[in-house]
Amino acid sequence: MAKPRPDLPPPAALRALADAEGRLTLRVTPGARTESIEIAEGRVLVKVRAKPHDGAANAAVLALLAEALGEATSRLHLLRGAIGRDKLVQLPPA
């Protein structure tokens, strides 16, 4: 069975929530049934299927966010939240 495409918001909507330095705050749910990025009440909620083991969930979050932004995963950097659900990610300049 093919993996369903994740539900992703437009890149402009995600970039609009970043601060002046291009940092985006995320709330992550690892081990979810489906992968998605939602914007709710001015917050970015990310759900990934990967379990939080050996950084697998963090890698999945960056890959999903990169897909939503149309950027390479290597251009995104996790600044804070390596072991928590609240994360701060540095986005590349638009």
Give, region by region, the residue ranges found by the protein language model.
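Contiguous, often N-terminal, cationic amphipathic patches that form binding interfaces
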Residues: 1-73, 77-94
